[in-house]
Amino acid sequence: MKIFDTDSIRNVALIGHSGEGKTSLAEAMMFEAKTIDRLGKVDDGSSTMDYDDEEIKRKISISLSLGYAIYRNTKINILDAPGFFDFEGEMVAALHAADSAVVVTSATGSITVGTEKALELCQEKKVSALIFVNAVDKDNSDFMGTARAIMAKYKSVIPIELPIMEGGKMVGCVDVLTDKAYDLQGKEIATPQNMQADVEEFNGKLMELIAETDEELMMKFFDGEKFTDEEIQKGLHAAIADDIFVPLVAGNAQTSKGVKRLMDKLVDLMPHPQRAHKIKAIVDGKETEVGVDPSAPFCAQVIKSVVDPY
């Protein structure tokens, strides 16, 4: 079995309101990474993560499930947490182990209570977050309404990709940072004219955010100079690490649309264990902070135990 260096690991919790597609997203991530060879469905009881008899019967997640996806030489450990408030402890456990979280919400045009709870828990636990707006091509979906509803309450949220829609279906996306558009196969296409205003608006917000992370970048921003790709990446990493930026992307987990691009963002932007926030621990009776250090003595954190009745 391949051993991954710390900077090639992402521990990611999938959290959010119940029924928004977290388990379907986990399934799609594993399928795209070829961890599994069949895209299972929650509705027919064939999903990998919902394996308990009660979960299959009720078509909901009841307990925290673990999976992984090896993508671009990076191991993404997936912690799929249930969304029902009755099982909130499972989500808290996932956030204790995760270095980042994907908050999954449907494109209903509004913000759900579960989305608010998930984002607030990430802030409380100091876990870097990314939002995945799911089911954008479902009937009567409203991606932009959903994005703006979340942005109105959480100023740190800015879309970094926008879905291209045709006939109510997602056919591609626009990268807000580069103003380049791509179809679902990754081929570059023209940015639709009716999306240009939104792209420019969000690009401006992102550039301003990046400028705020460094004095030299701020001066460059005020002088009207463009940032280099390296400066953009550095600024985004700093903003995410400082919990002042929550990227927002879109897709459809059930059909795997936008899932590879989501995994690209997890690899490129979200923290590996050494870059994540340190956790509090008791050492020799005193409270201290512990970070990840491959050269340090072994240290483990237990987040879940299971009693096997057999």
Label each residue range with its predicted role.
Residues 1-310:
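Structural and coupling elements of P-loop NTPases
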